[in-house]
Amino acid sequence: MGCRQSRHSRGKRAEKVEETQTELLEALDKEGRILEGRHEEAGQVPQTSNAQEKVSLSDCIQEAKASLQNTCASHVSPQEATQAKMNKVDGSILSRLYRNHIQDYGSPGPFWEQELESLHHVIEMKNERIHELEKQLFLLEMLKEKNLILALKNTTLRQEVEDLQFQAGNRLTMSRQLRKDLLQDLEKESQNGHCCSRRRSH
């Protein structure tokens, strides 16, 4: 209540200053017009002197107006500065009250509802991305298992090939040995046959 009354009284003082300024300006204009009319009605002063007095009177009126406006501005500016400070204080108080209201009642305004919707949309997009990454990870795990199975099969096949090569080498060695033995046996038989034929001839 005290803040409202002080703001109300300050507003009244500012309005009163503006009204006083307007009244003084109107009075100066009225006085200038009256003086000019008197000079024109008198008709006793030469034309040039009357024109000079009009110019001088107009300059005085303009100076008085400028001085009055500066004086009123000096009174209004502190009022505006004070009002700006009060608005700033009111804004901080309203912000704090709004935060407390949200904490107590959980009833956000349209702006925060839009922000929550945007946040919810972002969360949904992140969840979709996570699901996609999980699918990719699952496929990678399956490919990894398949690669392990293929690697085991490849190792088994290599072992079998090595065994077959070893067996083939052994058979080749055996066949060579058999051939060698056969040749030796044939040579022995042929030598024995020559010896027998010589004995018969003697």
Swiss-Prot record:
Q: Does the keyword Lipoprotein apply?
A: yes
Can you tell me where the transmembrane regions are?
none
Q: Where is the composition biased (Basic and acidic residues)?
A: 32-42
* Span list, region Disordered: 1-20, 32-52
Q: Where in the cell is it found?
A: Cytoplasm, Cytoskeleton, Spindle; Midbody
What keywords is this UniProt entry annotated with?
Coiled coil, Cytoplasm, Cytoskeleton, Lipoprotein, Myristate, Phosphoprotein
Instruction: List the coiled-coil residues.
Output: 112-146
Main location per UniProt? Answer: cytoplasm
The function of this protein is: May act as a scaffold to regulate the recruitment and assembly of spindle midzone components. Required for the localization of AURKB and PLK1 to the spindle midzone.
Family of the protein in this entry: Belongs to the CCDC69 family.
Full protein name = Coiled-coil domain-containing protein 69
Q: Which organism is it from?
A: Mus musculus (Mouse)
